């Protein structure tokens, strides 16, 4: 199975992807240990998260962070009853890339 570039994402898809990223941020912030690690890696302070969460690039970074930590990704996906791959789909949508599977 290969991937090919697909159509650009639609506005509704982008809003859904950003909502998933906000949910991921809430999940990370839901436990002090998770939040502390995120803040340490991102270099942000807790006071700047709320403003940063309004920026697409920050939300993209949240999804990258989540995708890079498989146990965290799986826990987030399970809590939100979504497949783990939905995080990368949302990431690609926010980044302006939309991928579709090639069908034989």
Regions found by a protein language model. Give the residues of each.
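Metal- and O2-centered redox machinery and metal/ROS homeostasis
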Residues: 1-104
């Amino acid at each position: 199975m290969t991937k090919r570039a697909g159509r650009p994402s639609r506005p509704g898809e982008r809003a859904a992807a950003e909502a998933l990223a906000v949910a991921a941020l809430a999940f990370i912030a839901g436990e002090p240990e998770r939040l502390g690690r995120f803040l340490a890696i991102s270099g942000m302070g807790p006071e700047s998260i709320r403003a940063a969460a309004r920026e697409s690039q920050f939300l993209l970074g949240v999804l990258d962070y989540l995708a890079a930590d498989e146990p965290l990704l799986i826990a987030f996906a399970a809590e939100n009853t979504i497949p783990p791959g939905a995080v990368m789909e949302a990431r690609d949508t926010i980044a302006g890339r939309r991928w579709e599977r090639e069908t034989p």
